[in-house]
From Swiss-Prot:
It is found in: Cytoplasm. Pfam families: FdhD-NarQ (PF02634). Required for formate dehydrogenase (FDH) activity. Acts as a sulfur carrier protein that transfers sulfur from IscS to the molybdenum cofactor prior to its insertion into FDH. It comes from Escherichia fergusonii (strain ATCC 35469 / DSM 13698 / CCUG 18766 / IAM 14443 / JCM 21226 / LMG 7866 / NBRC 102419 / NCTC 12128 / CDC 0568-73). This is Sulfur carrier protein FdhD. Mo-bis(molybdopterin guanine dinucleotide) binds at F260, C261, K262, P263, G264, R265. The gene is fdhD. InterPro entries: Cytidine_deaminase-like, FdhD. Keywords: Cytoplasm, Molybdenum cofactor biosynthesis. Its main location: cytoplasm. GO terms for cellular component: cytoplasm. One of its GO terms (biological process) is Mo-molybdopterin cofactor biosynthetic process. One of its GO terms (molecular function) is sulfurtransferase activity. The active site is at C121.
Length: 278
């Protein structure tokens, strides 16, 4: 497979993720108008010529999605395990063609599964229930986060959703410094995909997962917790609620899980010792 530089891949996926369509408003069904709707396309991740997963996603920043998914699913251990990547059109969507190291590809073949995902679904098509959970090393306790800094971050999360501002149809995942500043984020029609894009980008840039937290605009499902923990994230803030399985996984892997995050409000589900509130 042809090896492609990162900047070349970005040119392939330089898509807005928005399409204009004709629609009707409730108060005027006689006169159509033009409005923006978020794009959702099938994206296949193909490792060394073998299709591994098809996800429904926004057609942008797919190189970060592929890297983040590969890391958060345990397919690779570091970005160095990927030798090349191409984003190419396919008959019904897009393919991300990934060249893996031989060692990682052999491991992938041993645990290969075929997924046909709903929007951002990370478990559709697993071969048996035992395949759902992945062993995650317990996270260290290396930081303390002041909850008073959360409110400012919540007010700025929408800044990372330009498509969402136009369409009302995307989730966001952003990295939050201990100061409350958001220093990078991604959006997608799928919440898991938005998170994978963030994980992929920070890993590609060699950023540390300590001294900060992930903030997501969605609920906290177990996949969100597991993906975060697989990459070394110690604290996950979610705007909506957490599921019981998410709480169980977070407790087991030492991740601090916080839901119902609104200005002046937060519900801590696990490991509050990382949090400060004066």
């Amino acid at each position: 497979m042809k090896k492609t530089q990162q900047k070349e891949i970005k040119n392939v996926t330089n898509i807005t993720g928005v399409r204009q369509i004709e629609l009707w408003r409730r108060d005027d069904l006689q006169h159509p108008r033009i409005d923006e709707v978020a794009e959702e396309v099938p994206v296949a991740l193909v490792y060394n010529g073998i299709s591994h997963v098809v996800m429904m996603a926004s057609p942008k920043d797919l190189e970060y999605f592929a890297l983040g998914f590969s890391l958060s699913e345990g397919i690779i251990e570091s970005p160095r395990d990927i030798f090349g990547m191409d984003v190419v059109p396919s008959c019904n969507g897009l393919e991300v063609q990934i060249e893996l190291s031989s060692r990682r590809f052999m491991g992938l073949k041993e645990r290969r599964r075929a997924l046909a995902g709903r929007t951002g679904c990370g478990v559709c098509g697993v071969e048996q229930l035992n395949d759902i959970g992945k062993p995650v090393q317990p996270l260290p306790f290396t930081q303390a986060f002041d909850l008073n800094k959360l409110d400012d971050a919540l007010r700025h999360l929408n800044d990372f959703q330009p498509v969402g501002q136009l369409t009302g149809c995307t989730h966001a995942a952003a990295w939050m410094l201990p100061s409350g500043e958001l220093v990078g984020g991604h959006e997608d029609v799928g919440r898991h995909v938005a998170l994978d894009k963030l994980l992929g980008r920070r890993s590609q840039e060699g950023e540390s997962w300590q001294q900060g937290a992930v903030l997501v605009s969605s609920r906290a499902s177990y996949e969100m917790v597991q993906k975060s923990a697989m990459c070394g994230v110690e604290i996950l803030f979610a705007v909506s609620a957490a599921t019981t399985l998410a709480v169980e996984v977070a407790e087991r892997c030492n991740l601090t899980l916080v839901g119902f995050c609104k200005p002046g409000r937060a519900t801590v589900y696990t490991h509050p010792q990382r949090l400060i509130h004066n």
